[in-house]
């Protein structure tokens, strides 16, 4: 029987025209390769002159097969890295240092559980997961030069480990230091040193992850068509830009996170969707009172003593000699969730959404929505916990949706801190109905926005009212980018795609509009005899004359950013301890002396690193892509491109998260604006877009860096959505495997 199967497989291999097959092909079960070859014949991939894949399949499953194959062509290492992360298997590639990261994921992700969930999935979804695995395995089979670090074969159920396309999942809120202290030997509460280190990391200046989304109603556009800004702020090269279509009605264009078979932020012929990381509080900690009785563990819940669940978890890791070793853990769980740390004599359980099947359904089905009603019907799956949505369609509808997975809780409790797990009143009480969250549709002002700020300014004066909702609907408040978005969206009622781009790249830095006057006041109040008065006179004159706008030539931007970072370092820790806004603390709570000391520090650092405190911002702030590594090494001696826009922390809508790296004086960006698109929903959808660097992760490809200058300039290019738009812009037509 087995010999017969091998003979059939050998015959199939011999019949294949095209590249030599890898050993992966020979290890597949008999029939898999033949099935994959047959699917490939129903798929067409067209690469445009930017290297972007336009994938067409007869069925949705065929399209998924081609979509994931094309992604693998562009950057298989990032696909594998994402699944190693989400399966809890990173340590098998990176070694023992990643064990705690993997254990954190494995508290939720269990391969046997995912396989069972796959078996119970709707038939249509199983077909897509099967096609996804086939596409990746066929890529590996036809590319013998590609050597996976770990995942030499993909199984359909693995797709359920990575169902939501945002940059950081809820699970990442679990402290690795606290987790190691609890599950290490001996078990203990995290040390003061660990907590201090993690606190310092939490308050350090860094680029906020998230996104900008604007939806403009027809009443505020020149041509009477709804417009949408799609502007995710992620780590660079985190997503693939592509189009995926089928004869079954699939036709989605936009950004897909590497390894996923749905367009996460994008549009189809009728609707567009933009997700922004939400400030809603949907992740909670419950402090459990643990007792040992008869050698078993119990936790208090009301008048009950409930047994603590245990589960054995083995985490494999790559040893120094290259072999695989394992660490074994006994993990603990209550009905609230897994235990992730100890604090104040209690064990802390972590509660978050875990609905992988529904999440994958929702992520795919919304790409086929034809209007707001059908989009909202998909949202009723309530499997999105972490993202707001800005929506627009060709009916002229615009909308803002808060996340749909929002546990109903007793608002008397402060869920920003661990609540008493023994008190049933603190438990989750089901989920809120969509109508109970701050959603908006077609507000009279004609625009909607979110920039990872609260929902209570989403539509200017027509926004939801904070008093109407529980406290946990927002945990951040307003932000400099939110204030900036309101400013640009309120400024006109005749938006077009070009003017929407102008708004998205408006150079005003709202945070400094509040901060610089406090610095001026501190300086003006300084006695004339104080040495700082004369030393900082030129710097203050420059900042007082500044228009608060970034540009590559602006020396004031450099000085203001360096001053802001220095003052942040003096403010953030205490602001966090007091639960205060860092910006408010910087403006109101730092002393005049601290403000001036920070300015002197900024001036000195500019002079030391660049020879003059009057250094243009573009000389410092650079985009560099010199290799295809997931974690890049930057080098001042290598070519780079000046970027005029600044950090979103200062209110820049076009965000560029940059800093110094070991051995560099210049700042290099690694996050912020990544994929940017503007879309007009007229009789024919029209879109312009740009991606950081280029579509390919291969440094030898001409599409590795071909969009870099456009990215820095904010010069979006046409997105070829219709076949006639591709005419004259096609580099290659082929089928997978050719």
Write out the residue ranges for each language-model feature.
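Short, solvent-exposed cationic patches
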Residues: 68-93, 294-301, 420-431, 435, ...
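Hydrophobic alpha-helical segments
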Residues: 252-254, 384-492
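Acidic, low-complexity N-terminal propeptides/linkers enriched in Ser/Thr/Asp/Gly that mediate export
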Residues: 125-229, 234-235, 382, 394-398, ...
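Proteins synthesized as precursors that undergo proteolytic processing into mature forms
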Residues: 359-387, 394-395, 465-520
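Glycine- and hydrophobic-rich flexible loops that cap the catalytic core of alpha/beta enzyme folds
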Residues: 249, 253-260, 266-271, 275-419
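Gram-negative bacterial Sec-dependent N-terminal signal peptides
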Residues: 2-21
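Substrate-recognition/specificity elements adjacent to catalytic centers across diverse enzyme folds
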Residues: 26-239, 247-249, 254-262, 267, ...
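N-terminal leader/propeptide and maturation segments of large enzyme subunits in energy/redox metabolism
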Residues: 94-129, 133-145, 286, 342-343, ...
